[in-house]
Amino acid sequence: MADYQDKNVVIIGLGLTGLSCVDFFLARGVTPRVMDTRVTPPGLDKLPQEVERHVGGLNDEWLLAADLIVASPGIALAHPSLSAAASAGVEIVGDIELFCREAQEPIVAITGSNGKSTVTTLVGEMAKAAGVNVGVGGNIGLPALMLLDADRELYVLELSSFQLETTSSLQAAAATVLNVTEDHMDRYPFGLQQYRAAKLRVYEKAKVCVVNADDALTMPVRGADERCVSFGVNMGDYHLNRQQGETWLRVKGEKVLNVKEMKLSGQHNYTNALAALALADAVGLPRASSLKALTTFTGLAHRFQLALEHNGVRWINDSKATNVGSTEAALNGLHVDGTLHLLLGGDGKSADFSPLTRYLTGDRIRLYCFGRDGAQLAALRPEIAQQTETMEEAMRLLAPRVQPGDMVLLSPACASLDQFKNFEQRGDVFTRLAKELG
């Protein structure tokens, strides 16, 4: 455990994570200073009186005088103020690094462009099914520091590339990079390989690395080694097996579960289940209780979630698809009896949308594109696309056209912040309108 006594600590970014960092230091007899670029950041009213704060920008004087800066994942390490502090020899970490220095029990660490939250939650459910005292959080749910507890037996953390950039003490019992597709390119000026390098940090010092046999970018830099266990659709130690119209989860040649026993649907969710099972096995959770958890887990909100089924039409809320890879995952292997009405749009974060083109073929698909990058998305296949300003306009446009057997799918391939507070609000609006229009 690290000693922070007499250290000049500055925390950048409030919110729940920033407050968890403040509490962490106060509990150790250190009073940090806090700054946030927002004028009224969330959590400001909960900040103890004795904690100095600076809002509406960064305070370079504080940063240069610090011994330790705890930076929110929301601020780029390339920010001039942080670069100057780093050049002056100031140590810069994130809340995950603080957590890793304290945690005594095994950590399962999960990153990837898509599927992180589902796999993290699933491994947590598998641990609970085995009666293990588990802390689940990180980039989902509770901040990592709020999970620290002497009674814990296991931690399961979802980690973003931003969090991994400031983490060097992670020694995961099992770690995975589920997949690597373009995301956050606005934060990675050197492109996909720079983003991938941040993700791959999760494997450093890991006991077991769970890699995706279908995605070479998830392999450790030096290639697969004896630490690696693989999952994939048709290949890998954990893979899918299709026989006589049935699909099974299979481990090293042995069928372990028929997917019809699972509440989750879709090929991407079956591979998520394989990854979760590989991680659970790697930390010694009993296979029987892990499989039981797979049969009861209903999935997470806004992730290929059935919002409404009415008059033979399914309305699917996949608002969490905030990047191209996530929408590809939703469309890959998707079966629709009638026409697919696909809602795309929002802020594309400088991504290349062209990988979607291969899924937009045939005459049983219609595109409804909205938001900041709607025009770019409509240009993928203009003859079947209609562009509107908002998602609501798009939904009112498509509603009279749907027939029994059709599917209306919100899988926007974009962030939501151009028109919504977050992807959850976008999904909630979709669900409300589906119930009104369907």
From Swiss-Prot:
Location of the protein in the cell? Cytoplasm
Q: Does the keyword Nucleotide-binding apply?
A: yes
Gene Ontology MF, one: ATP binding
Xref: InterPro entries: Mur-like_cat_sf, Mur_ligase_C, Mur_ligase_C_dom_sf, Mur_ligase_cen, MurD
Instruction: Give the catalytic activity.
Output: UDP-N-acetyl-alpha-D-muramoyl-L-alanine + D-glutamate + ATP = UDP-N-acetyl-alpha-D-muramoyl-L-alanyl-D-glutamate + ADP + phosphate + H(+)
Q: Which keywords, in A-to-Z order, does the entry hold?
A: ATP-binding, Cell cycle, Cell division, Cell shape, Cell wall biogenesis/degradation, Cytoplasm, Ligase, Nucleotide-binding, Peptidoglycan synthesis
- Which biological pathway? Cell wall biogenesis; peptidoglycan biosynthesis
- SUPFAM superfamilies listed in its UniProt record: MurCD N-terminal domain (SSF51984), MurD-like peptide ligases, catalytic domain (SSF53623), MurD-like peptide ligases, peptide-binding domain (SSF53244)
Name the family. Belongs to the MurCDEF family.
Its function, per the record, reads: Cell wall formation. Catalyzes the addition of glutamate to the nucleotide precursor UDP-N-acetylmuramoyl-L-alanine (UMA).
Q: Protein name, please?
A: UDP-N-acetylmuramoylalanine--D-glutamate ligase
Its source organism is Salmonella choleraesuis (strain SC-B67)
Gene, per the UniProt record: murD
